[in-house]
Structure formats: structure tokens, C-alpha cells
Swiss-Prot record:
Protein name: Small ribosomal subunit protein eS1
One GO location term (cellular component): cytosolic small ribosomal subunit
Subunit structure: Component of the small ribosomal subunit. Mature ribosomes consist of a small (40S) and a large (60S) subunit. The 40S subunit contains about 33 different proteins and 1 molecule of RNA (18S). The 60S subunit contains about 49 different proteins and 3 molecules of RNA (25S, 5.8S and 5S).
Residues the record lists as N-acetylalanine modifications: A2
Organism: Yarrowia lipolytica (strain CLIB 122 / E 150)
Gene Ontology terms, MF aspect: structural constituent of ribosome
Length: 255
């Protein structure tokens, strides 16, 4: 006789439901801190499972890449089309210390810049900052009508495009290779490099809407906790202070 599973005996009682466990009871909230380069350092919060056994929460937090609107970091709606990527490098208590990981424009902003009767000029440059970060910067610019121009179109010649692209490359290398990553980030916010390119190319062909539209992190140096804490203005944990006691222990010479 074949031995098999008795379905009638193995059936559970009807009406008994499994206990539903809220998954959020096993998770903790962590505060995300942006570098001091930005006006608003409180980016938001993120969830992670609590440490259990060999699975540490810090291992799942470090390396997370977050995409934040620059308008939220600066408190200005003018930067709403700019996106900043922040990478979690260190966990201190319930605070996550982040560093710059990338920069980009929204797709709708890029589409709104492209118009008829003008020439789009792009360039990309790989630079090394003074603190050994390798970055690739993507520049975009558009020709505009010259003063007293009657013709509708503003198409640049191939020789002019090559000259403008050479100017873009030289200015980006000059502005980015002699500064730290934090200083370069500060230049990206007010579009300092874009205005420099517009001034330098005025004699070749007038440009408008010149931006660093994207920054890609290619390679980073070895992690330095001291440099990260300096970027965040010191440690974020609330450390206690030493208390000076007014009394001293009395030692009895004889009992």
C-alpha cells in the first residue's frame, strides 16, 4: 500500500488566520545629512532593517545613492531642474553623512532648451580635482542672435563650433582641476563656469543657455573620515562633556 500524505489530517482549522506582522517594526529611521556646501543639510529620512546577528544595518546604509532636487537643498525654486546625487559614506548614530556623487538636469529642462534655428554645441571633459576625484563634466550651449541681426537663423559654422568647443574644454579644465570637490560643487550651483564660457566665446559666436548639464563621478580616492567630517562641519553626534566633581574620595588611614 502506498504511503502518502493524508490531506484530511493535515488540513488546518478553518477560520484561523495567520498573524500579520508589520514589517516596519523591524526597521529604523535614519536622518540623511547633506554636506555643508548646501544651505539645507537635512535631506530627509531613510529606512533600513535593524542589525540582527551578522547582518549589520551600517553595511546596508553605506554606499546608498540618493537623488535630491537642488531646489530643496538650496531653498530656491530657480534650481528645480537640477538634480544632485548624494552617496552615504559614514553612519554616526542615527545620522548618515553623505558626499557629492553626481549632478544632472531633468529631461524636461533639456528638451525645453532645444529650439529651431540655432546650433547646439556640446563638449565633455574628464578632469581630476585637487583632492584626487576623477570627474567627467558635460557642457551644453546654444547659439543666439547677434546684435542688429536680421536673419532668423543663428547657425554657426563648423570652424566656429570647433573653436567654441575648444574654449569650453579649456575653461572647464582650468576651473575644475585646481579646486576640491566641495569647491567645484559650490561653482555648479550659481553656474559660474557657464558664464565664463559665454564671456570667452563672445568674439567667436554669441552663446546662450550655457550650462554644466551633467557631472559623472568616475573614480574617488581612498575614504578619509577626517575629510568627510570636515565637509560636514565636524562630528554630528552629541558627545557628553566631562563633569568636574567638587568632592574627593576620603581615604581612611586607619580603621
Amino acid at each position: 500500500m502506498a504511503q502518502g500524505k493524508n490531506k484530511r489530517l493535515s488540513k488546518g482549522k478553518k477560520g484561523i488566520k495567520k498573524r500579520v506582522v508589520d514589517p516596519f517594526t523591524k526597521k529604523d529611521w535614519y536622518n540623511i545629512k547633506a554636506p555643508s556646501t548646501f544651505e539645507n543639510r537635512d535631506v530627509g529620512k531613510t529606512l533600513v532593517n535593524r542589525s540582527t546577528g551578522l547582518r549589520l544595518a551600517n553595511d546596508y546604509l553605506k554606499g546608498r545613492v540618493l537623488e535630491v532636487s537642488l531646489a530643496d537643498l538650496q531653498g530656491q525654486e530657480d534650481h528645480s531642474f537640477k538634480k544632485v546625487k548624494l552617496r552615504v559614506d559614514e553612519v554616526q548614530g542615527k545620522n548618515l553623512l553623505t558626499n557629492f556623487h553626481g549632478f544632472d538636469f531633468t529631461s524636461d529642462k533639456l528638451r525645453s532648451l532645444v529650439r529651431k534655428w540655432q546650433t547646439l554645441i556640446e563638449a565633455n571633459v574628464t578632469v581630476k580635482t585637487s583632492d584626487d576625484y576623477f570627474l567627467r563634466l558635460f557642457v551644453i550651449g546654444f547659439t543666439k542672435r547677434q546684435a542688429n541681426q536680421v536673419k532668423k537663423t543663428t547657425y554657426a559654422q563648423t570652424s566656429q563650433i570647433n573653436q567654441i568647443r575648444k574654449k569650453m574644454t579649456d575653461i572647464v579644465v582650468r576651473e575644475a582641476s585646481n579646486v576640491t570637490l566641495a569647491q567645484l560643487t559650490a561653482k555648479l550651483i550659481p553656474e559660474v563656469i557657464g558664464r565664463e564660457i559665454e564671456k570667452a566665446t563672445q568674439n567667436i559666436y554669441p552663446l546662450q543657455n550655457v550650462y554644466i548639464r551633467k557631472v559623472k563621478l568616475l573614480k574617488q580616492p581612498k575614504f578619509d573620515l577626517g575629510a568627510l567630517l570636515a565637509l560636514h562641519g565636524g562630528a554630528t553626534d552629541d558627545n557628553g562633556k566631562k563633569v568636574n566633581r567638587e568632592f574627593k574620595d576620603v581615604v581612611l588611614e586607619s580603621v
